[in-house]
UniProtKB/Swiss-Prot annotation:
Transmembrane region(s): none
Gene name per UniProt: ubiG
Gene Ontology molecular-function annotations: 2-polyprenyl-6-hydroxyphenol methylase activity; 3-demethylubiquinol 3-O-methyltransferase activity; polyprenyldihydroxybenzoate methyltransferase activity
InterPro entries: SAM-dependent_MTases_sf, UbiG_MeTrfase
UniProt KW keywords: Methyltransferase, S-adenosyl-L-methionine, Transferase, Ubiquinone biosynthesis
Keyword check for Magnesium: no
Pathway(s) this gene product operates in, as recorded in its UniProt entry: Cofactor biosynthesis; ubiquinone biosynthesis
Family membership noted in the UniProt record: Belongs to the methyltransferase superfamily. UbiG/COQ3 family.
NCBIfam families in alphabetical order: UbiG
SUPFAM superfamilies xref list: S-adenosyl-L-methionine-dependent methyltransferases (SSF53335)
Binding site for S-adenosyl-L-methionine: R39, G70, D91, M134
Gene Ontology terms: biological process: methylation
Function: O-methyltransferase that catalyzes the 2 O-methylation steps in the ubiquinone biosynthetic pathway.
Protein name: Ubiquinone biosynthesis O-methyltransferase
C-alpha cells in the first residue's frame, strides 16, 4: 500500500486487530451494525436527491461510481452494490480487505476492494460520483489534507457523505465513557476524543478542501428502543454531512 501523510499507523493498527469481527453483529463492531440502517437511510436519500434517482427502482444507483473509504469489512459497500452502484472499497488496514472480499463473494456481489488510501487513489487519477467517508476523519493525522484528497476523488458535481463524532462533554460521556468503558461496545482506546470534530469545524474544513456543504444531520441513539434515527437538531454526538464538488 502506498504511504500517505494522513494515515495514522496507530489508528490503522486498532482496526486491523479487530478485522475478523466485522460481520459479527454481536461482536466488537456491534455499534456500527446497529447504526448502519440510520447511516444507509441518510446516504441513500442524499444520493437519490443529488442524482435524481428513484429509490423504488430495482437498481436506483446503476451507472454511479462510488468509493467507500475506510470500508472495513464492507458494511456500507455491500448495500451500495445491491442498489446498483459500481463500488470500490478502500481501507488502509490490510487485514480488512480479505475479510471484505470473502463476504462479498459469499453474498454474490462484485465489489473491488483495495488496500490503499484516498491520497493514492487521487494520485492515480481515480474519480467517483460518490465518496463515502464514514467514521474515518476522526482517525486521520491531517483532516484537511485528507478531505482535500476526497475532493480530488470526486467528479465535478460529485457528492461526499462524511460522518464523524462531535467534540463536547456529552460525546466524551457517551462515546468514550459509555461505549468503551462501561458498555464495552468497543475496545478501550478505539477513539481519541481529542480528534473528534465539531460540526462547525468540519464544515470549515470541508469548505477549505474545496467542497460545498449542503446538508447535515445528527444520528441519535435511543436507549429505550435500542435504535438510531436522524435528527435535524441534535448533532451533539454522532452526525453526518453531505457536500458537493461544484467544479
Amino acid at each position: 500500500m502506498e504511504s500517505s501523510s494522513t494515515i495514522d499507523p496507530a489508528e490503522v493498527a486498532k482496526f486491523e486487530a479487530m478485522a475478523a469481527e466485522w460481520w459479527n453483529p454481536h461482536g466488537k463492531f456491534k455499534p456500527l451494525h446497529q447504526m448502519n440502517p440510520c447511516r444507509l437511510d441518510y446516504i441513500t436519500q442524499q444520493i437519490a436527491a443529488e442524482f435524481d434517482r428513484d429509490l423504488s427502482a430495482p437498481l436506483p444507483f446503476e451507472g454511479l461510481r462510488l468509493l467507500d473509504i475506510g470500508c472495513g469489512g464492507g458494511l456500507l459497500s455491500e448495500p451500495m452494490a445491491r442498489l446498483g452502484a459500481e463500488v470500490i472499497g478502500a481501507d488502509a488496514a490490510p487485514r480488512n480487505i480479505p475479510v471484505a472480499k470473502l463476504h462479498a463473494e459469499q453474498s454474490g456481489l462484485a465489489i473491488d476492494y483495495r488496500n490503499t488510501t484516498a491520497e493514492a487513489l487521487a494520485a492515480a487519477g481515480e474519480r467517483f460520483d460518490v465518496v463515502l467517508n464514514m467514521e474515518v476523519v476522526e482517525h486521520v493525522a491531517d483532516p484537511l489534507a485528507y478531505l482535500t484528497a476526497c475532493r480530488e476523488l470526486l467528479k465535478p458535481g460529485g457528492l461526499m457523505i462524511c460522518s464523524t463524532l462531535n467534540r463536547n462533554p456529552k460525546s466524551f460521556a457517551m462515546a468514550i465513557v459509555g461505549a468503551e468503558w462501561v458498555m464495552r461496545w468497543l475496545p478501550k482506546g478505539t477513539h481519541d476524543w481529542s480528534k473528534f470534530i465539531t460540526p462547525d469545524e468540519l464544515y470549515d474544513l470541508i469548505r477549505k478542501a474545496g467542497l460545498d456543504p449542503v446538508d447535515r444531520k445528527g444520528m441519535v441513539f435511543n436507549p429505550v428502543s435500542w435504535s438510531w434515527s436522524l435528527s435535524a437538531r441534535d448533532l451533539s454526538v454522532n452526525y453526518v454531512t453531505a457536500s458537493v464538488r461544484r467544479t
